[in-house]
């Protein structure tokens, strides 16, 4: 069975508590449950991983390379805008990458408009709340089908 790795970056463990105007009230645990349901509907295995530690995220990405995951969906949180370490780790992957954000990063503060990940990703989905993850999984599923 194909496997998609969903990566949640820094501060995303605070979904449901942090800035509900931008991120809503759904918790990360609830988001992960929905992700599992959507993945089952799309016919692939999914693993969700969240950390607030950049080195741990890089290590999980390195492990994904060794595991030959079929696709990665990533919401790197604030790391999106400045973490060249995360970007360098993602560049190692052979699997397609889909970047997602719950809020529309292009309609927010200027510093959020730039993504160091975007150039590595097949595409970026943002601004649709929790549905950004669903759309990201659909994109990942389609990319897996195209690349195999």
Curated annotation (Swiss-Prot):
Similarity comment text for this entry: Belongs to the type-II 3-dehydroquinase family.
Reactions this protein catalyses: 3-dehydroquinate = 3-dehydroshikimate + H2O
Record flagged with keyword Cell cycle: no
Organism of provenance: Syntrophotalea carbinolica (strain DSM 2380 / NBRC 103641 / GraBd1)
EC number(s) from the headed UniProt entry: 4.2.1.10
InterPro entries in UniProt: DHquinase_II, DHquinase_II_sf
Annotated pathway: Metabolic intermediate biosynthesis; chorismate biosynthesis; chorismate from D-erythrose 4-phosphate and phosphoenolpyruvate: step 3/7
Phylogenetic placement of the source organism: Bacteria, Pseudomonadati, Thermodesulfobacteriota, Desulfuromonadia, Desulfuromonadales
Positions in coiled-coil regions: none
GO biological process: amino acid biosynthetic process; aromatic amino acid family biosynthetic process; chorismate biosynthetic process; quinate catabolic process
Stated name of the protein: 3-dehydroquinate dehydratase
